[in-house]
């Protein structure tokens, strides 16, 4: 059965990522891209994760606990995973190179009703990551239900030709004028007509009107 597409506001929501390798790094990037607060539990972290933080992270990380990033949105905990790490989290990502450990994490999270993704272990996932394109608040995402990541990457490549930075800016503009248009026109039909006219004019002219 296909996965239900649901867009969730992750701003300031607590997300745990277990593992410190390149796969974990890619998941960290995604979660930060959508505003989550990320905790990484790992005995060691890859250079890419180190480069996300301040220059002396190598020294700070040795202390065992380090909160990084100017916005204090990443916490690194240097040790092996413990089940209690999942408690209080809204989302958990098991991204270690140990399939048995990933399965254990997934089983614990499911028992606690915590959303969990075990990388490359579809049966252990209560959610999966889509391929996505993001221009500000405009997001397009593709999922194959975990069957064919190469297909979703193909679709993402096609969509990138359409979903441009201009459309991201245009979407921001449409959001800025939304309440004004709603207040000015009484019926849904009128509002839809005005929004469509503004949208089409901006696309045809290749220019976003001033607010």
Where do the model's predicted regions map?
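E1/E1-like adenylate-forming module used to activate ubiquitin-like modifiers
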Residues: 118-167
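Alpha-helix C-terminal capping/helix-to-coil transition sites in glycosyltransferase folds
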Residues: 12, 87-89, 135
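Glycine-rich, highly charged phosphate/nucleotide-binding loops
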Residues: 62, 69-87
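Hydrophobic, well-ordered beta-alpha structural blocks that scaffold small-molecule cofactor pockets
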Residues: 1-52
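Residue-level detector of alpha-helix initiation sites
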Residues: 22-23, 100, 146
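An accessory alpha-helical subdomain
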Residues: 146-211
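N-terminal beta-loop-helix "entrance" segment that forms/cooperates
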Residues: 45-72
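ADP-ribose/adenylate-binding Rossmann-like module
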Residues: 91-96, 102-129
């Amino acid at each position: 059965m296909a996965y239900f597409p649901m867009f969730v506001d992750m701003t300031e929501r607590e997300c745990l990522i277990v593992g410190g390798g390149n796969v974990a790094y890619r998941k960290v990037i995604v979660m930060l891209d959508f505003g989550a607060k990320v905790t990484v539990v790992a005995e060691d972290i890859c250079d890419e994760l180190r480069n996300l933080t301040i220059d002396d992270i190598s020294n700070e990380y040795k202390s065992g606990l380090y909160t990084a990033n100017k916005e204090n949105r990443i916490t690194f905990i240097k040790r092996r995973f413990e089940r209690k790490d999942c408690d209080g989290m809204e989302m958990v990502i098991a991204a270690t190179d140990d399939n048995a450990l990933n399965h254990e994490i997934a089983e614990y999270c499911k028992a606690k009703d915590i959303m969990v993704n075990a990388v490359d272990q579809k049966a252990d996932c209560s959610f999966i990551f889509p391929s996505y394109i993001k221009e500000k608040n405009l997001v397009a995402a593709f999922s194959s239900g975990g069957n064919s990541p190469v297909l979703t990457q193909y679709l993402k490549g096609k969509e990138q030709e359409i979903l441009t930075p201009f459309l991201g800016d245009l979407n921001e503009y449409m959001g800025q004028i939304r309440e004004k248009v709603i207040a000015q026109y009484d019926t849904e039909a009128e509002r839809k007509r005005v929004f469509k006219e503004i949208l089409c004019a901006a696309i045809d002219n290749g220019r976003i009107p001033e607010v």
